[in-house]
Amino acid sequence: MRTGEGTAAGSVEWGAHLPLIGLGASPSLPALRAYVRTAAALGFRYLCANDHLVFGRPWLDGPTTLAALIGESGDMTLATTSSLPVVRGPVHLAKALAAIDLLSGGRLIAGVGPGSSPADYAVAGIDFEQRWPRFDEAVRALRALLHGDPDGVEGAFYCTRGVVLEPRPARRPGPPVWVASWGSPAGLRRVARHGDGWLASAYNTTPERFRECLDRLAVALRDAGRPAAPFPHAIATAWLHVTEERAGVERMLAEVLAPMLNRPVEALRSLPLPIGPAEVCAERLSAFAAAGARRIFVWPLGDELAQLERFRERVVPLVSEHHGQ
């Protein structure tokens, strides 16, 4: 049994990550507006913002940037992929997400995760080893706050009993909460307990593993007393660079991704990321679609506008052709 959403086999909706780390030391709001307008015009359905407090490179704040670009986003669904309720605190994060949902007319997916960076926890003064129990409680508190539930949560780490944040989100009872997980058994059980959807990570999985995770998630949902279908999911943070030049591929892996992710180049070469010629990118993304992926969110590296256009013009048609979309 597998989670499903009633869509045609291989049908994929595309999302674009905001280039929060691609703007160097001088971020430009006009450049970001142009990026979002381009993504909307090219037919991307989702606009995504990741989240870190500190990072190895300059990082624009995700929720703030997403809010600043609502006016350019048309009818795109906005998604945090994912925000950090433990690091930010569930009340502070709920307040920000409620504002984004309200101002966008109810277009937000509240993607949340515990985060994998000890540095984020250190600057927030929170023990990294406590992230799992804190996350379980923080997600329940966040949902109660977004839903306007005055009973809230009273636990070991957070107390939101009697707290009602206003104004409320536009979507009722609240924006859907998708839980991020790399696909461990414990992580998928957490998705099944707390999530309205699952966010997978493109640089922490393969098509084969993703297919297995969908099957395990279906079991976890059943064990949690929830239906396996429909249960939405997406593969986020698919680093993208379409180039015909082998040197361009190596440059992206060695000079951009390896130091940014603190991973060996050899490990990155083994991942099925859409980096390389259009045919290679399409083949790798098609494999995820064949494994059951229904939404894939790409993060263009390099010249972001050119990469968005190149992806839409050269890669997407090949994926569609492969699956008869």
Where are these regions (language model features)?
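Active-site-adjacent structural elements that line small-molecule/cofactor binding pockets in enzymes
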Residues: M1-Q325
